[in-house]
């Protein structure tokens, strides 16, 4: 029987700060199979970067809570980089995408070898 390929996908995501109106940037990898564990793991790597001016894509709902308040996913450009209003935040998102690209290459190379 042929073993299924493990296509680990790495993506940049946002997590809302509990106390401020800012979002933490992190890189998430899934599925990651680790030794000693039967199920695939979701690996998160926080980048110690925050952004305050993401542009929200009003056509893509993330979730709607019990009160009916809707949250949205961030708007991304053609390369998948999160778009921001301020230049400094945009540079943080570009940095996060570079880290994502590096991690994706690491997972792809580990699959080959």
Question: Would you name each region that the model predicts?
Answer:
Residues 1-112:
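Basic/aromatic DNA-contact patch characteristic of tyrosine site-specific recombinases
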């Amino acid at each position: 029987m042929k073993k299924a390929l493990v296509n680990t996908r790495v993506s940049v995501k946002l997590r809302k700060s509990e106390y401020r109106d800012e979002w933490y940037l992190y890189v998430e990898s899934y599925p990651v199979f680790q030794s000693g564990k039967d199920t695939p793991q979701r690996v998160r790597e926080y980048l110690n970067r925050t952004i305050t001016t993401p542009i929200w894509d009003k056509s893509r709902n993330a979730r709607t809570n019990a009160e009916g308040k809707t949250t949205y996913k961030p708007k991304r450009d053609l390369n998948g980089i999160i778009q921001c209003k301020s230049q400094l935040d945009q540079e943080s998102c570009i940095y996060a995408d570079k880290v994502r690209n590096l991690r994706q290459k690491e997972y792809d190379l580990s699959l080959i070898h």
